Amino acid sequence: MAYSTIDDPTNFFRIKLYNGNNNAQNIAWDETDTNMQPDLLWIKTRSGNTVFNHVIGNAISGGDKYLHPNTTAAETSNANVIHTFNSNGFSIGGATFVSEGARTYVAWGWKANGSGSSNSNGNISSTVSVDQSAGCSIVSYTGTGSAATIGHGLGAIPKFIINKSKADGEHWGTYHEGLGNGKALALNLHDGAGTNSSYWNNTTPTDSVWSVGTSPLTNDNSASVAFLFAEKKGYSKFGTYSGNNNADGPFVYLGFRPTWVLIKDGGSGQHWHLVDSKRDVGNDGDAQQLSPNTDDSEAEVKSNRGTLPLDLLSNGFKVRTDGSSCNGTGSFVYAAFAESPIVNSESIPNNAR
């Protein structure tokens, strides 16, 4: 049996670095093939002292609509931000969030299945855009404020879920298998995980639905969107590691060379850390990091919270700091996506880093 069914992760996830110019732009992926529409697109300013929010758009909501993952703001319509999702990339307007002149930007894009289709597996009907082979599902639904289930279409158990009411004022509820079904994080906050049965109704997701309780963090009585990820060997992994509070930090085995890693201390008020291989190409002990819960640029993250010695290796990642934000004495959760599996479907190893 093949180690992984995904030989080329860029068929399902890509990263693009680009420069703003105060104008609308068509942004093409660096890869030469033209068959990876980013149905989930996340953009962040990398540079500058005047800070700009993160931006997330998705194909169900459609172009011209976006959310800010570092705030509680409502979904906004504006053609000058994310405009279209294209087969070889995406188009943007000239807004500061995505194309301020003399700024650098990073975009992360996941493939699902376009504008989606209806799903009635749960108590709450949903519209689902899903790619089962890559374990990525975008779900649009209307929350009820009462305990319920919602269909996701993955055909596998999601291990990482991020949801947001499209209305103003609600946080980004975040489920991670490593925390269990009684806890939740908020993507837009540095707080540790909260414990409450009203988050996920004390129920672990199944291969067809996930459960929500009565908390507005996870089931606000409003139009909402959720992004769900199931683990795929050699392509994605959502796990935990224990910090050792030592400069020789833990090695986390993934089974692939990571291209994107998100880390959060599950127990205390530490910021989220997000690194990728396009912005950090050399394992030089100073990973270029961004925080989903702040609008800080890379330089501001470093100034405010110091360097992040994190090596992205051929089979996982290695923490090389005793900093409490990613290697204190507690438990940390992570989400990671692959640049390449350790071996492909023909048992050929990838190159070590």
What label would you give each PLM region?
Residues 1-353:
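Surface-exposed molecular-recognition determinants
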